[in-house]
Amino acid sequence: MGVSKVAIAVAVMLMVVVINHPAVVEGLTCGQVTGKLGGCLGYLKGGGYPSPACCGGVKGLNSLAKTPADRKQACACLKTLAGSVKGINYGAASALPGKCGIRIPYPISPSTDCSRVN
């Protein structure tokens, strides 16, 4: 009986340790996406040519989105962000990667199916 009490105590202590240590979350967050593209808002609303800061953010985001899961997450975040900002010029948004000298494997559009992004 003493052994089972010790085993239970050890199991409880292990559960407490596991519960109190948050899991490491890997992957891209919407906060990172928003942070990288914050310098692009003027371009996305007014067109013209994106600033060097904007293109730096676009390139940085492209570098962060290393896996298909990251790219799907970035796509979903961009769609959410675009829906929350009034006055976005979607033609300018679609042209943004090319104007910054990068290629992405999916169109930037409110109708993009993020589940198909690889």
From Swiss-Prot:
SMART domains: AAI. Disulfide bonds. Disulfide bonds join C30-C75, C40-C54, C55-C100, C77-C114. Gene3D superfamilies: Plant lipid-transfer and hydrophobic proteins (1.10.110.10). Stable up to 84 degrees Celsius. The keyword Signal applies. InterPro entries: Bifun_inhib/LTP/seed_sf (IPR036312), Bifunc_inhib/LTP/seed_store (IPR016140), Plant_nsLTP (IPR000528). One of its GO terms (biological process) is lipid transport. The keyword Transmembrane does not apply. One of its GO terms (molecular function) is lipid binding. Found in celery but not in celeriac. Highly resistant to pepsin and other proteinases. PANTHER family: NON-SPECIFIC LIPID-TRANSFER PROTEIN 2-RELATED. Plant non-specific lipid-transfer proteins transfer phospholipids as well as galactolipids across membranes. May play a role in wax or cutin deposition in the cell walls of expanding epidermal cells and certain secretory tissues. This is Non-specific lipid-transfer protein.
